[in-house]
Structures are given as structure tokens and as C-alpha cells.
Amino acid sequence: MLAFTLRFIKNKRYFAILAGALVIIAGLASQHAWSGNGLPQINGKALAALAKQHPVVVLFRHAERCDRSDNTCLSDSTGITVNGAQDARALGKAFSADIQNYNLYSSNTVRTIQSATWFSAGRSLTADKKMMDCGSGIYASINTLLKKSQNKNIVIFTHNHCLTYIAKNKRGVKFDPDYLNALVMYAENGKLFLDGEFVPG
């Protein structure tokens, strides 16, 4: 009887520990959403909070490509579709509600330039061909843009293979971005860190 009682008490103790751990995990989950790919999700409000701590770098994949869609082209066949332009404009409006102060960059392709232009509704844009080079050298290129921007927030329109590389290299996760998906980064002492995936809303 004594042995049974001791086992029961021990089991109750383990149960209490387990229940407490589950409560803690549930509390953390309520504060931080995670994408199915393993990246933390960062919405507009969270991005604005991060931007108060340090300049943020938001890297977007361009909008829907014309040459891979049956939808109507905006203009040039190497650019984006009309739908893609409208999606970029809507995203830009939502983004600017939380982040008004940023410098805008893109790679030097028609599709990224058009995406950035529609996203920003005419904000000054700098095209940089180095945003096409998506290996380890991309970090030096981003740091160069940060210095040019005097450590302001920066938005960069680039390509899916760049985002895939960064997610794998920085967090070891597989990220296959859709059109206009984005990653959020920041720099500290010249080193870039990946905060997570930007999710509007």
C-alpha cells in the first residue's frame, strides 16, 4: 500500500510538472506565430516594433511574372502582370501603414523594378544588379545598402532564390517563397541576422 501511494504521489508530481510545461509552451505560442516552414511570422505591428529597436531590412520576392502567367502583362513581357502590379500596390499600402520611413532598392530586372515601383507608389528607387547575386556575397551587398541609407530601414525587391538561400543559410530551413513573400533581417556590428518571415496583417 505504501509503495502504491509513493508511486501515485510521484506520478502526480510528474503530471504537475508536465502540465506546467504545457502552460508555458501555450503562452509562448500565443505571443509568437510560426510559419509552417519553421520561420517566425512577423506582422506589420511586430515589424514596426522591431524597427524601433534597430533598422530593419525587408527583402521581397517580386510580383507575378508575366512570362510565367496567362494573366495580362503590365507592359514588358519580362516584367510583371497587371494582377501582380495591383497586388504590389495593395501590399505597399498595408506595409506603409506601419513602416513609413524606408529607402527602396531592387535588382536591375524589369520585374523587380516594376514590383518596387508599384509597391511604393512612386517613391525614389535605386536598382542594384548585386541583388541578383544570391550566394554568400549578398550579405556584403545588403550591408553596403544599409551604409548608403545611413542605417535607415530598407526594402529590397529581389528573387526567390535569394530568399531561399538566406533562410537556409541563416536558420537552416527550407523557404520556397511565393510572389511578394518577404524575409525580415537586421544588422548588428556588420553581421546580418534573420528575424523571420514578413506576413502582412
From Swiss-Prot:
Keyword list, A-Z: Hydrolase, Periplasm, Signal
Cell location: Periplasm
Keyword Signal: yes
Gene Ontology BP terms: lipopolysaccharide metabolic process
HAMAP family the UniProt entry points to: Ais
Keyword flag Hydrolase: yes
Main localisation: periplasm
Pathway linked to the protein: Bacterial outer membrane biogenesis; lipopolysaccharide metabolism
Secretion signal, residue range per the UniProt entry: 1-33
Disulfide cross-links: none
Domain of life assignment: Bacteria
Organism, as annotated: Salmonella typhi
Its job: Catalyzes the dephosphorylation of heptose(II) of the outer membrane lipopolysaccharide core.
Record InterPro entries: His_PPase_superfam (IPR029033), LipoPS_heptP_Pase (IPR011310)
GO molecular function, one term: phosphatase activity
Family: Belongs to the phosphoglycerate mutase family. Ais subfamily.
EC number: 3.1.3.-
A single Gene Ontology CC term: periplasmic space
Protein name per UniProt: Lipopolysaccharide core heptose(II)-phosphate phosphatase
Enzyme class: hydrolase
